[in-house]
C-alpha cells in the first residue's frame, strides 16, 4: 500500500484548517520520500469529480458509471486490477531503425501481441472459485460471493480493470526524432503514440466488455526482463 496525502482547499495554503498537517507531510517526504501527493483539484477535473487513492504505487482504477455505491457515488474500494502487460516503446523505435512508417507498423504489431498477453491473464482468472481466497472473494475485501461461486462476473463490465503498460516514451522520442518527449517538436509524436495506446484499449474494451486501460509501468523489474530479451 502507498501512503497518500491529498492536497485540497482545506490544507493547501497557509492559514487553512489542516495546513499544519501539510507541513508535517512535507517534512516527512523530505526525510523518508513518503507520502506521495494527489491534487484533489486536478483529479476532480480528470475523474468525473471523484478523488480516490491508487492501488499500490500508481495504478488507478477507471471511473465506471456501471459501478456505483449505494450512496450514488462511484465505487472504487473493493474493485481490482487483473494484471498488466507492458509494451517496450524503446524496442519498437529501435526495431524501426528510425523509419516512421515502419515504427507505426511495428507498434500496431506489438500492441496486438500485448493484447494476446492480456487475454492470457484474463482467461487464467476465468473459472476461479471464490473458495481460493475467502477473505478476498467471500468476506468483502473484493466481493461477497457465495461459496463455490466463480469470480467471472467481476472480470467484466468495469468491476475490474486490466492494464496495457507502456515504458520508454522519452527514449522512443530520442531514437526517432533526437528530441525528448517534452520538446515542442517531439511532443505531438509522443502524444500520438499515447493516443494510439488509448484507442487500442477503447477498441478492445468495446469488443470484449473488459476494462482495458493504459498504465505507466514502474519498470523496476521489467527493465531487467527487457534487457534479457
PLM region spans:
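Contiguous, well-ordered alpha-helical segments that form the cores/surfaces of helical PPI scaffolds
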Residues: 162-175, 195
Amino acid at each position: 500500500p502507498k501512503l497518500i496525502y491529498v492536497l485540497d482547499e482545506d490544507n493547501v495554503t497557509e492559514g487553512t484548517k489542516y495546513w499544519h498537517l501539510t507541513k508535517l507531510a512535507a517534512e516527512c517526504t523530505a526525510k523518508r520520500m513518503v507520502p506521495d501527493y494527489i491534487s484533489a483539484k486536478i483529479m476532480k477535473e480528470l475523474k468525473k469529480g471523484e478523488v480516490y487513492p491508487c492501488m499500490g504505487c500508481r495504478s488507478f482504477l477507471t471511473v465506471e458509471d456501471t459501478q456505483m455505491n449505494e450512496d450514488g457515488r462511484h465505487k472504487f474500494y473493493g474493485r481490482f486490477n487483473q494484471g498488466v502487460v507492458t509494451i517496450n516503446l524503446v524496442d519498437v523505435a529501435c526495431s524501426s531503425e528510425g523509419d516512421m512508417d515502419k515504427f507505426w507498423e511495428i507498434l500496431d504489431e506489438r500492441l496486438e501481441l500485448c493484447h494476446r498477453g492480456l487475454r492470457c491473464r484474463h482467461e487464467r482468472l476465468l473459472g476461479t472459485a471464490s473458495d481460493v481466497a475467502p477473505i478476498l472473494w467471500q468476506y468483502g475485501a473484493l466481493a461477497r460471493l457465495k461459496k463455490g461461486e466463480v469470480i467471472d462476473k467481476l472480470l467484466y463490465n468495469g468491476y475490474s480493470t486490466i492494464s496495457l503498460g507502456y515504458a520508454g516514451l522519452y527514449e522512443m522520442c530520442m531514437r526517432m526524432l533526437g528530441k525528448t518527449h517534452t520538446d515542442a517538436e517531439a511532443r505531438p509524436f509522443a502524444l500520438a503514440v499515447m493516443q494510439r495506446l488509448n484507442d487500442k484499449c477503447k477498441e478492445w474494451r468495446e469488443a470484449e466488455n473488459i476494462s482495458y486501460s493504459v498504465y505507466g509501468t514502474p519498470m523496476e523489474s521489467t527493465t531487467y526482463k527487457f534487457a534479457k530479451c
